[in-house]
Amino acid sequence: MLSGYSEPLVWNKLSLAPLWLRGKFLSLIEREKEHAKNGRPARIIAKMNSLCDPGIIEALYDASEAGVEIDLIVRGICCLRAGIKGLSEHIRVRSIVGTFLEHSRIFYFENNGNAEYYMGSADWMPRNLDKRVEILFPIEDPILQEEIYHILHIQLSDTKKAHLLMPDGHYVKAVSYTHLRAHE
């Protein structure tokens, strides 16, 4: 499978593109949507470099309309519009461009209080989900999960280098009386 030309094997925990990764992400987003519709805790935090896949964006809009709280940390291109009433009012997008060129892709799904953490190589872009060999794997160790949650919290709290995506598509600098920089 590593070449992309061989017969797919059965994988227990890994999700690979171009075969299963899109479906995995869509099912995780859909599960959060169902939790929200049924009044259960539902939240998505995703950190990546780019978000421009129409199918993923549509799924995020649907999840937002159902009440899922969605925080996206997207360093580069983001084709999603956040904060639009009736469409994406539960979605917040921030971009952090600091000292380091980060390439981490981290995904958190609240899952009704049974949080699931994933890391991988793919951004939410058609070329990553459909045309490249990419991987997603779960983080199951509770100590690592705690560390990852801490990292995400720091990223979401950054007020020094973060810019917030507005509903009209432009970014504004995050402001706060406390200055926290994620890249320190």
What are these model-predicted stretches?
Residues 51, 124, 182:
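Hydrophobic pocket-lining residues within nucleotide cofactor-binding pockets
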Residues 1, 5-8, 96-167:
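HKD (HxKxxxxD) catalytic microenvironment of the phospholipase D
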Residues 19-27, 42, 50-58, 71, ...:
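Conserved structured core elements
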Residues 178-184:
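Conserved small/polar residues in nucleotide/adenosyl-binding loops
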Residues 1-28:
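Active-site cores of enzymes that catalyze phosphoryl transfer or operate on phosphate-rich substrates
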Residues 13-21, 47-53, 77-80, 166-173:
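A glycine-rich phosphate-binding loop feature that marks nucleotide/adenosyl-phosphate handling sites
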Residues 27-92:
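Primarily the HKD phosphodiesterase
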